[in-house]
Amino acid sequence: VSAWRNGMNNALPLAPVFSLTALVKACQVVASYAPLGNTSAAAPAKLHFFSGLWSNLADTFWGSPANIAAWVSVPVATSIIVNTNIDERVNTAVSRNPVWGRSTDTFFLQTGNFAAAVPHSILFVYGYFWGSGETAAAGAAGLQALGVNGAIVFGLKWASGRPRPVYDATTGTTQRDKEFNFNIAEQSIDSGRWRWPSGHTSSMFAMAAAFHGFYPDKTWIPFVLYPLSGLMGFAMINGNYHWTSDVVAGATIGTVVGFTIGRNFRRMYAGTQKSVTKIDGKPVLDWYVTPRQSEQGMALALTALF
């Protein structure tokens, strides 16, 4: 029809189009009778500790206005708590009348050295080798969050040089609450100046927030894990291992790092679910033909999906 409408000069260019149409139809007929074999979906690669590390690290600091505001609040809140004597008053109060005994404080201190990493380690190892990709991703999110959180907290501890609170029964006060040493050249492993921010608190909040970010639809997670993390933070104050401002800073840092990385791992996992169809273990090219028409004539568009 187009040939007659556009004149006989257009007849020859249309011939390859009609030949291509016949060839496509023939291929479709042959393919319909070909044995398919065992059709399966290619399993997407499972996420691990280093997946999206650099982009997650960047998002942690300036990925959103909320994150930026949280980081700004860390030194601001510390300054307010220190200069209004809240640190000294709270630690003095728990030194005079502790909520629980020393053995409980010691339990939290020792357990906090590894407790935050246990659930994520179990999920990752099981999910990566035997379970689902989602389970592995949930575990990897927490492990990466703990690693990033640990590096940040260690750097801040080294830079701030803050001593631990020590209650003086003679004066009835907890001194050195305003003491920081920002001269990193004077810092050392055995200096005892490693209190700001609280690593135990930040690790627990990073664990909780990573779960929260990865499983936002599980409403029980924030109501269970955040209070448990807060309990760890209070134990650090009750045992005079940390000042109140140490715990507040640690909780803020852990929450920002954990939730950001957990949320990003959920997005990365969702992106890996677009798998490629396979037949007998070999990828199959999915394609289709679409007719096109314009003022210049007719044609066929061949689209391939792989």
Features from the language model and the residues they span:
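Interfacial helix-start motif at the membrane-water boundary
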Residues: 101-121
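Alpha-helical transmembrane segments of multi-pass membrane proteins
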Residues: 78-88
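Alpha-helical transmembrane segments
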Residues: 71-77
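Structural signal for the C-terminal ends of transmembrane alpha-helices
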Residues: 84, 126-131
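A generic alpha-helix surface/boundary motif
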Residues: 75, 88, 119-120, 150, ...
